[in-house]
């Protein structure tokens, strides 16, 4: 695996990890849907994993941390845990990638470095999946409630910017992890060992006929 491909994979994975952090912190998983009579409103509501915010028409914004975890919808409760685990996995994957990087001397053996890099790629792939699942789950819930006639219009929401950031984070980590998983051990380690057999050499004198005799034959 070339160093350029390794750097590209690690850079994409790190960028995806940063986007995951933004997705986790941004309180815009759900935003007010401007439909029906609510098209003219004096405030906009944002809902995130950790807090909700109300933006007034004057530009003033007030945010409040959720008082209870049980007050959150089921998809946001699961998203909290999965997104945090995804961030921690990506951190661990980054540390493993640095250990197995070709530009570091933590490990001297090239074969071991390649295997460590593959492990880092798998960790980033898992982090991408753990980011993709809650983001897609939340988007599905928002769309389902939006078209549900039993849900009041005042309670309907639209997808916020955090969901799009989460999808981008998942895509970047998937691509970066896939590039790191392309790291293979050097082919020299798989080359078959060739065994060369040579005829035994005689220590006795060689006659004119080319046959070697031991000296005891002349006694």
UniProtKB/Swiss-Prot annotation:
Region ranges (Interactions with TJP1, TJP2 and TJP3): 218-219
Membrane topology reported for the UniProt record: Multi-pass membrane protein
PANTHER family: CLAUDIN
Residue ranges, Cytoplasmic side: 1-8, 102-115, 181-219
An MF annotation (GO) of this entry: cell-cell adhesion mediator activity
GO biological process: actin cytoskeleton organization; bicellular tight junction assembly; calcium-independent cell-cell adhesion via plasma membrane cell-adhesion molecules; cell adhesion; cell-cell junction maintenance; epithelial cell morphogenesis; establishment of endothelial blood-brain barrier; negative regulation of cell migration
Function: Plays a major role in tight junction-specific obliteration of the intercellular space, through calcium-independent cell-adhesion activity.
Pfam families: PMP22_Claudin (PF00822)
Main location: other
Keywords of the record: Cell junction, Cell membrane, Membrane, Phosphoprotein, Tight junction, Transmembrane, Transmembrane helix
Subunit structure: Can form homo- and heteropolymers with other CLDN. Homopolymers interact with CLDN1 and CLDN2 homopolymers. Interacts in cis (within the same plasma membrane) with CLDN19. Directly interacts with TJP1/ZO-1, TJP2/ZO-2 and TJP3/ZO-3.
Keyword Transmembrane helix: yes
Transmembrane stretches, start-end: 9-29, 81-101, 116-136, 160-180
InterPro entries hit by this protein: Claudin, Claudin3, Claudin_CS, PMP22/EMP/MP20/Claudin
Gene name of this polypeptide: CLDN3
Residue numbers carrying Phosphoserine: 198, 208
Subcellular location field: Cell junction, Tight junction; Cell membrane
Topological domain ranges for the Extracellular compartment: 30-80, 137-159
Name of the protein: Claudin-3
Keyword Phosphoprotein recorded: yes
The family this protein is said to belong to: Belongs to the claudin family.
Stored Gene3D superfamilies: 1.20.140.150
One Gene Ontology cellular component annotation held by this UniProt entry: lateral plasma membrane
Residues with Phosphotyrosine modification: 197
